[in-house]
């Protein structure tokens, strides 16, 4: 799997993820890009799970964003409905973390769209480790969102064998608005 972390703080939302692709117990690739900017850079998305499945879902999500003029919540719900009802999509095993300047969501294959507590998302095999680290950093430091994501991914990578140190991090800065 992988680790994807999203933190929102002080006018920024950040999503970061590692680059490891595993096949069983073998590392197949170490520099996969699992975090992307969508909808003219206004939406961030990261995925965990089967890489081919996740790319399929990411493409579908991007199409939903276009269809709903960038409305993140409506696009997330539309994708979740399709994911739940489409026989082919139902077999896909992945999770998506998506965020814009207003909201963040986790989209699951069960058709769930979850708005997380504390504007923090951590998914994938190292998600619990990254979430614990991010909560501690949010509650006990004044670090910015990007630094918290970086440190959380590092900690998760030190513990989880399916998470590496090759990170992709995207920042959406809306503090000037």
UniProtKB/Swiss-Prot annotation:
GO annotations of cellular component type: HslUV protease complex; proteasome core complex
Give the matching Gene3D superfamilies. Answer: Glutamine Phosphoribosylpyrophosphate, subunit 1, domain 1
Q: Does the keyword Protease apply?
A: yes
Where does this protein reside within or beyond the cell? Cytoplasm
What are the binding positions for Na(+) in this chain? 157, 160, 163
Q: Does the keyword Metal-binding apply?
A: yes
Q: Which UniProt keywords apply?
A: Allosteric enzyme, Cytoplasm, Hydrolase, Metal-binding, Protease, Sodium, Threonine protease
How its function is modulated: the record gives:
Allosterically activated by HslU binding.
The entry lists its GO molecular-function terms as: metal ion binding; threonine-type endopeptidase activity
State the active site: 2
Query: Where does this protein chiefly localize?
Result: cytoplasm
Q: What is its EC number?
A: 3.4.25.2
> Which reactions is this enzyme annotated as catalysing?
ATP-dependent cleavage of peptide bonds with broad specificity
Q: Name one GO biological process term.
A: proteolysis involved in protein catabolic process
The record describes its quaternary structure and partners as: A double ring-shaped homohexamer of HslV is capped on each side by a ring-shaped HslU homohexamer. The assembly of the HslU/HslV complex is dependent on binding of ATP.
Matching HAMAP family, A to Z?
HslV
Q: Which family does it belong to?
A: Belongs to the peptidase T1B family. HslV subfamily.
What the protein does comes down to: Protease subunit of a proteasome-like degradation complex believed to be a general protein degrading machinery.
Against PANTHER family, the record matches this protein to: ATP-DEPENDENT PROTEASE SUBUNIT HSLV (PTHR32194:SF0), METALLOPROTEASE TLDD (PTHR32194)
Q: What is this protein called?
A: ATP-dependent protease subunit HslV
């Amino acid at each position: 799997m992988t680790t994807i972390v999203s933190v929102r703080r002080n006018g920024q939302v950040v999503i970061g993820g590692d680059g490891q692709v595993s096949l069983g117990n073998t590392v197949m690739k170490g520099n996969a890009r699992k975090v992307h900017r969508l909808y003219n850079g206004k939406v961030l998305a990261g995925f965990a799970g089967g890489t081919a499945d996740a790319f399929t879902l990411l493409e579908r999500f991007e199409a939903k964003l276009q269809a709903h003029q960038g409305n993140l919540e409506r696009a997330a719900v539309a994708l979740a409905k399709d994911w739940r009802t489409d026989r082919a999509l139902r077999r896909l095993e992945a999770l998506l973390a998506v965020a814009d300047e207003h909201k963040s969501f986790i989209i699951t294959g069960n058709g769930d769209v979850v708005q997380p507590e504390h504007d923090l998302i951590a998914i994938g095999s190292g998600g619990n480790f990254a979430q614990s680290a991010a909560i501690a950093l949010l509650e006990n430091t004044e670090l910015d969102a990007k630094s918290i994501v970086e440190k959380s991914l590092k900690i998760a990578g030190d513990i989880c064998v399916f998470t590496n140190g090759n990170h992709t991090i995207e920042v959406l800065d809306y503090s000037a608005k």
